[in-house]
């Protein structure tokens, strides 16, 4: 990296760290609510419009959004990289998963490298991917889903958890168990977040983790009135997140089917084509048409059987 670029990034980190660190509690809450409405509310409504026409998912890509949230909550900026380097300037990692409008089960993926990758990195005098993960100060996890069994339209739920990666023994033990269990080209350690569940149980076949003591917040975004979105803090953001005093708790893996998939409402996955005239006035005329939600119900049932 050229010196000028390196200096610019370093200066940007310094300035943003001061700005983020000086935010009051009320300012952090205001910024988070504004972000939730902009990126989870308005963007999802816009995507639904185009999904009705194309039959594609109205899922919101939460990757970079989760990093925005983490920076506001933890007061730590990013480095301006796109997919390269640390997610936060202090070396912390951010993971996101979302199921606002879709039928597949999201996961938090951790690329810990294969055995061959480990050997290659060590031959160059570099730490392995697993060693780098276990060396980060904090792991910030974000999940965006909808509460199960809530009246239509169900609110968009945004939850975050933060782990002290140096002090959380059960979290570290599970990572190390995966690292020692690798065979061949196995590299991806997947944690299944509690999509559609009100608890904080994170699932992996090597063992589950209870995240309830590291929950940072639980916010619900209602779009019942799309012109006036409302946010309810089911679990408010604490006034202080760092240092993280809570710890995860190891649980036994319950076996396949112990926690069946809970999907979003079918009509939210694929809107009916009879809405297209109103969604695209001047281009498409209102007309009676076969409602694709009926087809979607059949597709969803098949997906539930596949992923359960």
UniProtKB/Swiss-Prot annotation:
Keywords: Endonuclease, Hydrolase, Nuclease, Restriction system
Catalytic activity: Endonucleolytic cleavage of DNA to give specific double-stranded fragments with terminal 5'-phosphates
Protein name: Type II restriction enzyme MamI
A GO BP entry: DNA restriction-modification system
Organism: Microbacterium ammoniaphilum
InterPro entries for this protein: Restrct_endonuc_II_MamI
Gene Ontology molecular function: any one: DNA binding
Pfam families from the UniProt entry: RE_MamI
Keyword Hydrolase attributed: yes
EC nos: 3.1.21.4
């Amino acid at each position: 990296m050229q010196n000028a670029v390196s200096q610019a990034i370093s200066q940007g980190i310094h300035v943003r760290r001061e700005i983020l660190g000086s935010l009051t509690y009320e300012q952090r809450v205001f910024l988070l609510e504004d972000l939730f409405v902009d990126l989870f509310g308005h963007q999802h409504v816009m995507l639904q419009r185009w999904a009705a026409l194309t039959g594609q998912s109205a899922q919101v890509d939460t990757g970079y959004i989760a990093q925005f949230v983490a920076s506001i909550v933890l007061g730590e900026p990013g480095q301006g990289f796109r997919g390269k380097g640390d997610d936060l300037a202090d070396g912390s990692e951010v993971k996101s998963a979302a199921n606002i409008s879709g039928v597949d089960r999201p996961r938090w993926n951790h690329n810990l490298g294969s055995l061959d990758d480990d050997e290659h990195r060590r031959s160059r005098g570099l730490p392995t991917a697993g060693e780098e993960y276990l060396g980060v100060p904090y792991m910030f996890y974000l999940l965006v889903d909808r509460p199960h069994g809530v009246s239509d339209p169900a609110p968009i739920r945004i939850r975050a958890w933060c782990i002290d990666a140096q002090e959380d023994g059960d979290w570290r033990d599970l990572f190390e168990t995966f690292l020692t269990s690798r065979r061949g080209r196995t590299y991806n350690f997947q944690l299944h977040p509690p999509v559609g569940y009100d608890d904080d149980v994170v699932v992996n076949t090597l063992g589950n983790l209870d995240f309830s003591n590291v929950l940072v917040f639980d916010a619900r975004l209602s779009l019942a009135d799309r012109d006036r979105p409302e946010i309810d803090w089911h679990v408010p953001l604490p006034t202080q997140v760092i240092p993280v005093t809570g710890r995860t708790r190891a649980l036994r893996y319950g076996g396949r089917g112990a926690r069946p998939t809970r999907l979003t409402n079918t009509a939210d996955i694929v809107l009916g084509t009879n809405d297209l005239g109103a969604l695209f006035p001047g281009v498409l005329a209102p007309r009676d048409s076969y409602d694709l939600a009926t087809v979607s119900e059949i597709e969803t049932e098949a997906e539930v059987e596949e992923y359960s």
